[in-house]
């Protein structure tokens, strides 16, 4: 999973992710928006879920995060598409709507995102 964090023209924080993980970037940009307390809550919940049979969800306006003991899933709330309705030979492109990631990689990314926010706060 490749990603980068940068400041946009207005000084806000922008996350960009590689193909197959784009939904994570959209989720950070749309739902988290640099909220340190929310990042800390997610990291705490991940620690509680890891190695257990628990699951945890954070339902957002556009994207939602689901965590289990092995991986996370970020999914667009509007992702309800029946593939049976597609014409033969066609497929539905949903790479921008759903992404999966291992817990350790996701936690590392969140910690780097948190650090980037703290180092680049608007003065």
UniProtKB/Swiss-Prot annotation:
<comment type="similarity">
    <text>Belongs to the UPF0231 family.</text>
</comment>
<dbReference type="Pfam" id="PF06062">
    <property type="entry name" value="UPF0231"/>
</dbReference>
<dbReference type="InterPro" id="IPR008249">
    <property type="entry name" value="UPF0231"/>
</dbReference>
<protein>
    <recommendedName>
        <fullName>UPF0231 protein PMI2039</fullName>
    </recommendedName>
</protein>
């Amino acid at each position: 999973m490749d990603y980068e964090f940068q400041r946009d023209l207005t000084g806000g924080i922008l996350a960009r992710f590689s193909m197959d993980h784009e939904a994570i970037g959209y989720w950070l940009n749309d739902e988290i928006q640099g909220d340190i307390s929310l990042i800390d809550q997610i990291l705490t919940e991940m620690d509680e879920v890891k190695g257990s049979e628990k699951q945890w969800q954070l339902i957002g306006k556009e994207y939602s995060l689901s965590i289990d003991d092995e991986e996370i899933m970020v999914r667009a709330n509007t992702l309800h598409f029946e593939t049976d309705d597609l014409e033969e030979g066609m497929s539905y492109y949903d790479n921008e709507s759903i992404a999966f990631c291992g817990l350790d990689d996701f936690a590392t990314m969140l910690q780097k995102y948190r650090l980037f926010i703290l180092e680049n706060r608007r003065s």
